[in-house]
Amino acid sequence: MVRKPGSMYRNVRQRSFTRRKYMGGVPGSQVIHYDMGDKANTTFPVKISLVAEEKCQIRHTALEAARITANRHLVADAGKMGFYMKLRVYPHEVLRENKQATGAGADRVSSGMRRAFGKNVGTAARVNSMQKLFTVAVEKQNFPAAKKALWHAGQKLPTPVRIVIDEGAELVQ
C-alpha cells in the first residue's frame, strides 16, 4: 500500500494512543540518533533552538528527515566536532490507518467502515505550541551555519517554526 500524506496525521484530533502493551505490531521509529556532533563537549557558548509555533503531530519520518538535513549542514559548515545537536521530542503516538481496497471488485473484498479501528502504520510526536524541537550548541563563529541548518530542518516539518537564541545572544548581536 502507498504511504498516506503526513497532512492526514498533522492535527491532534483524538486522545493519545500510546499504550503499546495492548497493541500488536507497532512499527519501529525511524529516528535513530537523538544526540549528534561533539557529545563529550555540550558546553558551547551559543545555543539556539527550533521552536514549533502550532500544536501538531510530527511523524517519525519527518523528524528523521529534519535531523538528517540539519546534521548534514552542520557537519559541512562547522565540522564533525564543531557543534552539539539534540532532538528534543520522541514519537510516542501510534498512528492507525483503516486500509481501503480499490479497483475492480473492491466492494466484494472490502468491509468499508465496518470494524474501522485501523492497523498501526507508524508513530508521531505530539508537539505543543512554542515547544522546542531541536537545540544546537555551537561556537560564536558557527552561529550562521547553525541558524541555516535549523532553517533547513524546519522546512521538513508540518508546522510553522521559529529559531530562538537560548544562550549567548549578546555574543552574536
UniProtKB/Swiss-Prot annotation:
Pfam short name (any one): Ribosomal_L16
Key words, A-Z: Ribonucleoprotein, Ribosomal protein
GO biological process, one term: translation
InterPro entries for the chain: Ribosomal_uL16, Ribosomal_uL16_arc, Ribosomal_uL16_CS_euk_arc, Ribosomal_uL16_dom, Ribosomal_uL16_euk_arch, Ribosomal_uL16_sf
An example molecular function term from Gene Ontology annotations: structural constituent of ribosome
GO cellular component: ribonucleoprotein complex; ribosome
Cross-referenced SUPFAM superfamilies: Ribosomal protein L16p/L10e
PROSITE patterns: RIBOSOMAL_L10E
Signal peptide range: none
Family: Belongs to the universal ribosomal protein uL16 family.
Protein name: Large ribosomal subunit protein uL16
Species, as recorded: Methanosarcina mazei (strain ATCC BAA-159 / DSM 3647 / Goe1 / Go1 / JCM 11833 / OCM 88) (Methanosarcina frisia)
Lineage: Archaea, Methanobacteriati, Methanobacteriota, Stenosarchaea group, Methanomicrobia
The gene coding this protein: rpl10e
